[in-house]
């Protein structure tokens, strides 16, 4: 698998201001609905879809390093995506000189 990096913000400070006092926000990066999570001064990007039954995680809460689905209360580790025998896709964030990038895996023969 390869990773394609997509620029999505200017800086971590911009993200802090955008989130204000919220912990989570649904955003779209390259036509993908993702959830931006701010927890313990770290930022995470996860798929905005619970792997349990496909519900959106827009109203999820963050507890003890886990994102908790508001519908069925399944919790998923923010760093690994693991939880309840299921796996929530998470995406790396990389800071470069010109901004913040989200990494999305893709398959390529070359």
Regions from the PLM with identified roles:
Residues 55, 73-75:
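Flexible, glycine-rich terminal cap/loop adjacent to redox cofactors
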Residues 60-66, 82-87:
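Short linker/helix segments within small regulatory modules
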Residues 50, 69-72:
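Short cysteine clusters
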Residues 1-63, 91-110:
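N-terminal pre-ligand scaffold of iron-sulfur
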Residues 78-81, 86-94:
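Low-complexity, intrinsically disordered Gly/Pro/Thr-rich segments
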């Amino acid at each position: 698998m390869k990773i394609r990096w997509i620029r999505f913000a200017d800086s971590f400070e911009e993200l802090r201001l955008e989130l204000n006092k919220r912990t989570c926000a649904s955003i779209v990066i390259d036509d993908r609905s993702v959830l931006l999570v701010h927890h313990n001064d770290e930022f995470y990007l996860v798929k905005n879809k619970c792997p349990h039954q496909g519900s959106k995680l827009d109203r999820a809460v963050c507890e003890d390093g886990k994102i908790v689905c508001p519908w069925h209360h399944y919790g998923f580790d923010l760093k690994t995506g693991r939880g309840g025998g299921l796996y929530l896709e998470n995406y790396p964030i990389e800071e470069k000189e010109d901004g913040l990038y989200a990494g999305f895996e893709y398959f390529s023969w070359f």
